């Protein structure tokens, strides 16, 4: 099968949508299909396109965005028509139901090619509310042949919106790469972590929806009781820089924060996670965060909100600690609870969390689910 994969984001862009697009497109190719990925690029001139062969069966096509969204989408459709004339696609996958999902659906409807739309979480939440385009969201969900959702809670939202079933395809993580390991004293010294420091951590692209103020509040309150540092593994999104500066305006707090910047090497991300005593994910809304699964796979104790799919992977006091989104100001209290637990209890939480990843979120499990979705496509088109 020749599949057109229309992605909202794709590496070298960072973030969960980009990484999942790369992972799933490669997985489709491993199932024996050829994949052409199309993504809009902000670093290319308007309408300029470049194509790269990522593997023998995966090609990446990037096209520069125009200043106006409507012109960008029309340019994209012209490029996709040209690409289809070259490749003759059998199926289309739209990864993220916003611009990518609309392009995939519109093109598929007009070319009579079956379309699968993959909802990632933030796409549904954003389009539901102004200035999101609810009408376009609803049209896409009704016109595509198959809907895939990253979580059960997201599938339920889709069913409420359009009374259609969505197949759940959770995220996966490489648990061999993200695995428990010893502390690295050299790295801790390079980061400025002292032996007496408790280390709270966060991984990913830090922004408002990830609960930035609650991370800083947890650091402030925990540091009042014991020396504490906050290790931010990643970078702050550009448009949230102002909020970050306001939240860390206190010099006494800012000096306790270690901001690594973006780390492209997954092995190095895992190495940083292993230096942390508790990973915090105080998200306000979510899909299924990759960083949460990575921390669980590393065997690092996790404290997270109940946003999105988090309760589907993390059970309070069984595989971690869960804080209701209405009580994120109490993150530090849950940190205290974790730190006061006996060592074997904390180990039990970490082992249970890693077992969840091994059982439900391994690449092999994702591949099996993906295979079933793709094999069912012809039947869904006939109906």
Model regions: which residues?
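Glycosyltransferase donor-sugar binding loop
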Residues: 41-44, 173, 203, 229-243, ...
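Conserved acidic donor-binding segment of nucleotide-sugar-dependent glycosyltransferases
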Residues: 316-317, 321-328, 337-343
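Conserved donor-binding/catalytic core segment of Leloir-type glycosyltransferases
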Residues: 4, 194-210, 216-220, 231-233
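Nucleotide-activated donor-binding/catalytic signature segment of Leloir-type glycosyltransferases, i.e.
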Residues: 243-263
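Short hydrophobic beta-strand element within catalytic cores of glycosyltransferases
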Residues: 301-304, 314
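Carbohydrate-associated surface elements
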Residues: 153, 172
């Amino acid at each position: 099968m020749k599949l057109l994969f229309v992605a909202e984001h794709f590496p070298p862009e960072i973030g969960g949508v980009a990484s999942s697009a790369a992972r799933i497109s490669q997985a489709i190719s491993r199932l024996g299909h050829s994949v052409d990925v199309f993504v809009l690029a902000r670093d290319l001139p308007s309408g300029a396109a470049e194509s790269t062969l990522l593997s023998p069966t995966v090609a990446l096509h990037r096209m520069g965005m125009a200043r106006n969204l409507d012109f960008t989408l029309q340019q994209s459709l012209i490029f996709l028509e040209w690409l289809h004339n070259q490749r003759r696609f059998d199926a289309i996958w739209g990864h993220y139901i916003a611009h990518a999902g609309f392009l995939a659906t519109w093109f598929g409807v007009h070319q009579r090619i079956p379309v699968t739309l993959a909802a990632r979480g933030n796409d549904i939440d954003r389009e539901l509310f102004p200035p999101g385009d609810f009408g376009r969201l609803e049209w896409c969900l009704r016109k595509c042949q198959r809907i895939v959702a990253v979580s059960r809670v997201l599938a339920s939202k889709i069913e409420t919106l359009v009374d259609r079933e969505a197949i759940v395809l959770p995220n996966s993580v490489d648990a061999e790469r993200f695995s428990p390991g010893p502390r690295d004293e050299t790295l801790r010294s390079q980061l400025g972590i002292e032996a007496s420091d408790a280390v709270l951590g966060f991984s990913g692209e830090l922004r408002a929806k990830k609960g930035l103020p609650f991370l800083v509040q947890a650091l402030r309150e925990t540091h009042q009781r014991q020396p504490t540092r906050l290790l931010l593994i990643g970078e702050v999104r550009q448009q949230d820089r102002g909020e970050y500066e306001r939240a860390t305006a206190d010099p006494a707090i800012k000096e306790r924060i270690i901001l690594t910047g973006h780390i492209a090497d997954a092995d190095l991300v895992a190495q940083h996670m292993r230096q942390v005593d508790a990973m915090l994910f105080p998200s306000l809304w979510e899909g299924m965060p990759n960083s949460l699964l990575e921390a669980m796979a590393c065997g690092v104790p996790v404290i997270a909100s109940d946003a999105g799919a988090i309760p589907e992977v993390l059970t309070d006091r069984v595989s971690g600690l869960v804080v209701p989104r209405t009580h994120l100001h109490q993150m530090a209290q849950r940190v205290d609870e974790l730190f006061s637990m006996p060592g074997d209890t904390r180990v039990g939480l970490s082992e249970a969390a890693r077992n969840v990843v091994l059982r439900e979120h391994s690449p092999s499990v994702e591949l099996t689910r993906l295979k079933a979705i793709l094999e069912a496509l012809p039947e869904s088109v006939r109906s």
